Design a protein with these regions (language model features):
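Secondary-structure edge/capping motif, primarily at the C-terminal ends of alpha-helices
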Residues: 59, 66-83, 95, 102, ...
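Immediate post-signal-peptide N-terminus of mature secreted/exported proteins
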Residues: 29-100
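A structural signal for alpha-helical segments
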Residues: 43, 50, 83-86, 90-93, ...
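Long amphipathic all-alpha helical oligomerization modules
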Residues: 43, 47, 158-227
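Long amphipathic alpha-helices with heptad-repeat character
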Residues: 52-66, 95-98, 102-116, 150, ...
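Bacterial N-terminal signal peptides
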Residues: 12-25
Length: 227
């Protein structure tokens, strides 16, 4: 037994008190670790969901810009132009924006993949802290299912971007072709392929829209309910 002097007078520090403090310290540390783990998991989820939203938006923007470029191309090729040079300059500007947006979409998909790796690794670590075996198995299965769904999401986005790439390059080639011979006869020479080219574009745009919708639904399911 030890007697300590404080401002309010002496108080006794018993062995039981010391033992209680020693036992409580690990419990407090475990609680703090669990709290940090839970908070970190929420942060990682938020970052993952945000990365998914940014990716869907970037892919959608790239698709819309490709559509705008195709529309500008169609207007120049299929309709008489009173200002051929001016319209072509606008088309070139639209094409440059299309290429920039496509590159940005590719970067966002890669960033989403990285965020997914961090999210799923952290989630797997958190599951290890579940003591109930049945509950832990259920959490593991949900993790596996979520990873599988995410694999489908990212694959569909990559496939959508991959499918648009040759179309975008072909569109760029035809725009360059016009630039080398900016005459009414050159435009007329492209008209026979315009309808088929546009039909192909519509099919690819629809495929991209479907991929974006799938991604949005997946990430919406990961959002925490907010009061």
């Amino acid at each position: 037994m030890r007697k300590l002097i404080g401002r309010g007078g002496p108080f006794v520090l018993t062995g039981a008190f010391v033992l209680s403090g020693l036992l409580m310290a690990p419990l407090i540390a475990i609680t703090q670790t669990a709290e940090r783990s839970r908070t970190q998991g929420l942060k990682e989820t938020d970052k993952f969901v945000k990365a998914g939203g940014n990716t869907s938006e970037a892919v959608g923007t790239a698709k819309l810009q490709t559509q705008k470029t195709l529309d500008a191309y169609n207007a120049l090729v299929t309709q008489p132009s009173k200002n051929m040079k001016g319209d072509y300059k606008k088309l070139m500007k639209s094409m440059d924006s299309m290429n920039d947006q496509a590159a940005e979409a590719g970067r966002k998909v890669d960033q989403m993949q990285q965020a997914g790796d961090i999210y799923f690794t952290g989630r797997a670590e958190t599951i290890k802290n579940i003591q109930d075996p049945q509950l832990q198995d259920r959490a593991k299965q949900r993790l596996v299912d979520s990873q599988k769904d995410f694999g489908g999401v990212i694959e569909s986005l990559r496939e959508g971007a991959k499918a648009l790439e040759p179309f975008r390059k072909q569109l760029s080639d035809q725009i360059t072709y016009l630039g080398s011979d900016l005459t009414p006869s050159a435009m007329a020479s492209l008209k026979p392929n315009a309808e088929q080219f546009n039909a192909r574009g519509s099919e690819l745009f629809a495929k991209t829209d479907k991929a974006i919708a799938t991604a949005n639904a997946y990430f919406q399911g990961l959002r925490s309910a907010e009061s």
